[in-house]
């Protein structure tokens, strides 16, 4: 039982001026009223704080704010399933990311007569992922071409994903996809996978920065479906990841002066042909003809006045890896010649990134333009 607080012993006080009786009565009333209001305000604040605390606990598992697909309601007790908030799908940046990735896949697989229209629906069974990886890596995978049953599809998907993970060499916590999530058509998992592939192989595309998806995590508790929402980041600063985050004169040319860009291209074509013509070679397309690294290696030998042994590089590279090795070797020759390490990555050149190729060739032009 609560007890009333005991009164404190009286303490002598200093004399105070006497107030008129009516004013004292008013002060007493207002004091009581003020104390009551203060207590009520404090009680309200405590109540609101308690409610806020309860909401913080309960809201993450609140009733689902939208209608679920019938398949997504078939959960066992305590089973958890994730899905994209339908409202998040209309985000312009997410739409842009999906379009860029779809266009990239279709460009890579143009010779396979494969047209992707929907990432989740077209990639879940592993068929397109297999073809995409084979094309990017120039390696044939030992898997069945056509699979109909779910078991066969998952077996194929397992093989494809294992090979992809082996190539990407990502730490386990960075791998945000698996057989079950991809086969379940998880857009989040498939996007993470495609972004990782495009960045590893230095795809000649520009991914939008800071794309996030609102993900709804659904769980069945005591027979009731409850949910919580989390923000899943798909892309961060893609410029920094690609190694092209520092703007230079070529960024300005591409963005604001296409006419001057054409002049630069013609100047560089004239420069490289002046030397490559000595080997009866000629360049007309800068972005494509330097992509395998062969012309870069030969050009460095001509500029520095030495013969590059043919066993030092791949004269007819037939895989992405061999092309990257060629370009890397050419970069080493440039550094041996006194140039700084090129800012672009070898993969950028192999993927026909024009801006990266121009940067490398312009550095050569600056140093060797007077070489006959």
Swiss-Prot record:
What ranges does the record give for the region Interaction with ARHGAP31, renumbered to this chain? 21-25
Coiled-coil residues are none
| Source organism | Homo sapiens (Human)
How would you describe this protein's topology in the membrane? Answer: Peripheral membrane protein
Assembly and binders = Component of the heterotrimeric IPP (ILK-PINCH-PARVIN) complex composed of ILK, LIMS1/PINCH and PARVA; the complex binds to F-actin via the C-terminal tail of LIMS1 and the N-terminal region of PARVA, promoting F-actin filament bundling. Formation of the IPP complex is dependent on protein kinase C and precedes integrin-mediated cell adhesion and spreading. Interacts with TGFB1I1. Interacts with ARHGAP31. Interacts with the actin cytoskeleton. Interacts (via C-terminus) with TESK1 (via C-terminus); the interaction inhibits TESK1 kinase activity. Interacts with PXN/PAXILLIN (via LD motif 4).
A Pfam family assignment: CH
List all Low complexity biased stretches. 1-11
Family assignment from sequence similarity: Belongs to the parvin family.
Query: Which BP terms from GO are recorded?
Result: actin cytoskeleton organization; actin-mediated cell contraction; cilium assembly; establishment or maintenance of cell polarity; establishment or maintenance of cell polarity regulating cell shape; heterotypic cell-cell adhesion; outflow tract septum morphogenesis; protein stabilization
In its UniProt entry, what is this protein called?
A: Alpha-parvin
Region annotation (Required for interaction with TESK1 and ILK) ranges: 223-372
Region annotation (Disordered) ranges: 1-45
- Report whether Membrane shows up as a keyword of the record: yes
Upon changing residue 4 to D, the result is: Loss of interaction with TESK1, however no effect on interaction with ILK
Q: Which residues carry this modification: N-acetylalanine?
A: 2
Functional description taken from the UniProt entry: Plays a role in sarcomere organization and in smooth muscle cell contraction. Required for normal development of the embryonic cardiovascular system, and for normal septation of the heart outflow tract. Plays a role in sprouting angiogenesis and is required for normal adhesion of vascular smooth muscle cells to endothelial cells during blood vessel development. Plays a role in the reorganization of the actin cytoskeleton, formation of lamellipodia and ciliogenesis. Plays a role in the establishment of cell polarity, cell adhesion, cell spreading, and directed cell migration.
The compartments listed are: Cell junction, Focal adhesion; Cell membrane; Cytoplasm, Cytoskeleton; Cytoplasm, Myofibril, Sarcomere, Z line
Phosphoserine occurs at which residues?
A: 8, 14, 19, 28, 62
A GO molecular function held by the record:
protein kinase inhibitor activity
Q: Which GO terms describe its cellular component?
A: actin cytoskeleton; cytoplasm; cytosol; focal adhesion; plasma membrane; Z disc
The family database entries (SMART domains) matched by this protein are listed as: CH
Domain called Calponin-homology (CH): residue spans: 95-202, 262-369
Show which residues constitute the signal peptide.
none
As annotated in Swiss-Prot or TrEMBL, what is the tissue specificity of this protein? Widely expressed, with highest levels in heart, skeletal muscle, kidney and liver.
Report keywords, A-Z.
Answer: Acetylation, Actin-binding, Angiogenesis, Cell adhesion, Cell junction, Cell membrane, Cell shape, Chemotaxis, Cilium biogenesis/degradation, Cytoplasm, Cytoskeleton, Membrane, Phosphoprotein, Repeat
């Amino acid at each position: 039982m609560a007890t009333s607080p005991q009164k404190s012993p009286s303490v002598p006080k200093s004399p105070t001026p006497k107030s008129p009786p009516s004013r004292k009565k008013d002060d007493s009333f207002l004091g009581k009223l003020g104390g009551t209001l203060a207590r009520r305000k404090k009680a309200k604040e405590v109540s609101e704080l308690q409610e806020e605390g309860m909401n913080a606990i309960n809201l993450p598992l609140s009733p689902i704010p939208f209608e679920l697909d019938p398949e997504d309601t078939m959960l066992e007790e305590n089973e958890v399933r994730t899905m994209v908030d339908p409202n998040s799908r209309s985000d312009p940046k997410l739409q842009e990311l999906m379009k860029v990735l779809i266009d990239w896949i279709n460009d890579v697989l143009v010779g396979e007569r494969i047209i992707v229209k929907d990432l989740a629906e077209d990639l879940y069974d592993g068929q397109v992922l297999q073809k995409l990886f084979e094309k990017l890596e120039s390696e044939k995978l030992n898997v069945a071409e056509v699979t109909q049953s779910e078991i066969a599809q998952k077996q194929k998907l397992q093989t494809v994903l294992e090979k992809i993970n082996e190539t990407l060499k990502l730490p386990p916590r960075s791998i945000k996809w698996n057989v079950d999530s991809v086969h379940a058509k998880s857009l989040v998992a498939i996007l993470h996978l495609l972004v990782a592939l495009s960045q590893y192989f230095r795809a000649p595309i520009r991914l939008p920065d800071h794309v996030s998806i609102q993900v709804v995590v659904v769980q069945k508790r005591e027979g009731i479906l409850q949910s919580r929402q989390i923000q899943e980041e798909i892309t961060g600063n893609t410029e920094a990841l690609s190694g092209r985050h520092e703007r230079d004169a070529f960024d300005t040319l591409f963005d604001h002066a296409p006419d001057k860009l054409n002049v630069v291209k013609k100047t560089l074509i004239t420069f490289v042909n002046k030397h490559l013509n000595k080997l009866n070679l000629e360049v007309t397309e800068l972005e494509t003809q330097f992509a395998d690294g062969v012309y870069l290696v030969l050009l460095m030998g001509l500029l520095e006045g030495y013969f590059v042994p043919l066993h030092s590089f791949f004269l007819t590279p037939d895989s992405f890896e061999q092309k990257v090795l060629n370009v890397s070797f050419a970069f080493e020759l440039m550094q041996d010649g006194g140039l700084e390490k090129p800012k672009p990555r070898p993969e950028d050149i192999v993927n026909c990134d024009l801006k990266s190729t121009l940067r490398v060739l312009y550095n050569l032009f600056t140093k060797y333009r007077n070489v006959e």
